[in-house]
């Protein structure tokens, strides 16, 4: 086999297959290591937080990448946030510690931030800037892609219709996730959102139905951590290794002791890799982003350093638009085999769902999975509260041919009974058990069994969709048939067969 070092790119002549790796790599080299003259300045005017202000710059361009060389020779990367006639405001991804206004030099490259991508990135661990930190060799890039991605034409989007089976009943039956959907996990500090996300990653796959051709899928996972502690990063890495999926996982880790400003580019680099796996390699990619609250706080820090007019709780007014540039990169595209499904995790400050971060996230994404503190206190795992949880694409991913014909009606009836049980429980605290009617007592019984048998399950318990639906019917048999108003008579005839006492 010919060594890569022996290949002279200038010796390749004649027609070239554009799909060969050597051609892709040659194109990437020409594109990124151009010999255009670059401009270097030693005119740093000042440093403000994560920002460096450079004066007397000729034609600075918005989003242009800047190489900043410190007096000790260390090189850091930055990006132009604001440009005027002869001034540029540069955000430094690795932080501004050690930047000397007199001796620091800035090289304006004239290009945007492009991330090297390759199929070899699977099974590797990178820092928040996309550099390997697993003591492995550098990745040989197949291409260099803009980290901001390319906007998908809405006409070319495919509506998500294939349900992902997570093995968790509270999600599969009540809040079904479709392939290509973006659905966040709303949690709070101290709740097991990491364990739930790891279980979804471990057990996630297409619905396996008896009598149907259940093909194996080309699956990959991209995990991006922003501002997490070492314990969280180690938990996910260990979980991926134990379940044997580490070869299909690409990890990007920005830890709590890493520069805050780096959190701005970490999710974008991760999604650029995911888009390459999905749209160029035909893989079905699941992207887990944690913690989006840390990302939003980094955004607020930059906004404060630029002295912009703050919005609610000090967050910038453009945070909605900025979050949308991340969340909207999920989906499916016509003519491409792969898909991107996003599960962002965000911890709500003070468990407040009206906080700007979960509030704006809920506007953009297609539903949410809500982790409840009260269920967690009662040792129910996973503590998913099905009432505020929602999946807006569930209606197109369930039903006959996809899951089972009773799925939608069964879910509606379980919702109604659980909500009624909650109302009766609140009323019982006021008037006492003696004042409750026989129907109210049935709702209380259903409430207890629903949380114990349906919501609660083991961390490694993988229920099929059929098993979860059957558990739902077992619970509804608590009620007489005439009380189940939301299920058609034909389905009751088929599935409601009450055992004789």
From Swiss-Prot:
Any one GO CC term of the record: cytoplasm
SUPFAM superfamilies: P-loop containing nucleoside triphosphate hydrolases
Keywords, sorted A to Z: ATP-binding, Cytoplasm, Hydrogen ion transport, Ion transport, Nucleotide-binding, Transport
Location(s) in or outside the cell: Cytoplasm
CDD domains named among the record's database cross-references: ATP-synt_V_A-type_beta_C, ATP-synt_V_A-type_beta_N, V_A-ATPase_B
Gene Ontology MF terms: ATP binding; proton-transporting ATPase activity, rotational mechanism
PROSITE patterns xref list: ATPASE_ALPHA_BETA
Pfam families named among the record's database cross-references: ATP-synt_ab, ATP-synt_ab_N, ATP-synt_VA_C
Record note on what altering residue 172 to N does: In eb30; reduces self-fertility at 25 degrees Celsius which is almost abolished at 18 degrees Celsius
Consequence of gene disruption: Spermatogenesis is arrested at the primary spermatocyte stage.
Function of the molecule: Non-catalytic subunit of the V1 complex of vacuolar(H+)-ATPase (V-ATPase), a multisubunit enzyme composed of a peripheral complex (V1) that hydrolyzes ATP and a membrane integral complex (V0) that translocates protons. V-ATPase is responsible for acidifying and maintaining the pH of intracellular compartments and in some cell types, is targeted to the plasma membrane, where it is responsible for acidifying the extracellular environment. In neurons, required for necrotic cell death probably by promoting intracellular acidification.
Protein family per UniProt: Belongs to the ATPase alpha/beta chains family.
Protein name in the entry: V-type proton ATPase subunit B 2
Organism: Caenorhabditis elegans
Gene: spe-5
């Amino acid at each position: 086999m010919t060594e890569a070092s022996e290949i002279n790119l200038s010796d390749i002549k004649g027609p070239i297959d554009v799909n060969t790796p050597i051609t892709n790599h040659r194109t990437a080299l020409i594109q990124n290591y151009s010999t255009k003259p670059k401009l270097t300045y030693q005119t740093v005017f000042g440093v403000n937080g994560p920002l460096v202000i450079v004066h007397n710059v000729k034609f600075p361009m918005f989003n242009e990448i800047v190489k900043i060389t410190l007096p000790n020779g260390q090189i850091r990367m930055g990006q132009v946030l604001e440009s005027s006639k002869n001034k540029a405001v540069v955000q430094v991804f690795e932080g501004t510690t050690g930047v000397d206004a007199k001796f620091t030099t800035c090289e304006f490259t004239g290009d945007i931030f492009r991330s090297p991508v390759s199929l070899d990135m699977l099974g590797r661990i990178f820092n928040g800037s996309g550099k390997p930190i697993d003591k492995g060799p550098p990745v040989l890039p197949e291409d260099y892609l803009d980290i901001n991605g390319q906007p998908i034409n809405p006409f070319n989007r495919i509506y998500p219709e294939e349900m992902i089976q997570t093995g968790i009943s509270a999600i599969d039956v009540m809040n079904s996730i479709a392939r290509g959907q973006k659905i966040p996990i709303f949690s709070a500090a101290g709740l097991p959102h990491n364990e739930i996300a790891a279980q979804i990653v471990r057990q996630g796959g297409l619905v396996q139905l008896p009598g149907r051709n259940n093909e194996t899928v080309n699956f990959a996972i991209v995990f991006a951590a922003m501002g997490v502690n070492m314990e969280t990063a180690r938990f996910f890495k260990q979980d991926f290794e134990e379940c044997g999926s580490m070869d299909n996982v690409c990890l990007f880790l920005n830890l709590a002791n890493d520069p805050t400003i780096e959190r701005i580019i970490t999710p974008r680099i991760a999604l650029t890799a995911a888009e390459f796996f999905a749209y160029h390699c035909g893989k079905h990619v699941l992207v887990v982003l944690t913690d989006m609250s840390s990302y939003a706080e980094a955004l607020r820090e930059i906004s404060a350093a630029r002295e912009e007019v703050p919005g609610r709780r000090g967050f910038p007014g453009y945070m909605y638009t900025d979050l949308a540039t991340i969340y909207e990169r999920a989906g499916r595209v016509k003519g491409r085999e792969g898909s991107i499904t996003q599960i962002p995790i965000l911890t709500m400050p003070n468990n407040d769902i009206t906080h700007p971060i979960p509030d704006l996230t809920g506007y953009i994404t297609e539903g949410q999975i809500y982790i409840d503190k009260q269920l967690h206190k009662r040792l129910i795992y996973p503590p998913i509260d099905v009432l505020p949880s929602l999946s807006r694409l569930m209606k197109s991913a369930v039903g006959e041919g996809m899951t089972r014909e009773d799925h939608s009606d069964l879910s509606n009836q379980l919702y109604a009974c659980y909500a009624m049980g909650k109302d009766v429980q609140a009323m019982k605290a006021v008037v006492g058990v003696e004042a409750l009617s026989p129907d109210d007592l049935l709702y209380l019984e259903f409430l207890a069994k629903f949380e114990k048998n349906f919501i609660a399950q083991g961390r490694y318990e993988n229920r099929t969709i059929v098993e979860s639906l059957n558990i739902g019917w077992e619970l509804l048999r608590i009620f007489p048939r005439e009380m189940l108003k939301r299920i058609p008579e034909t389905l009751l005839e088929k599935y409601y067969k009450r055992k004789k006492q």
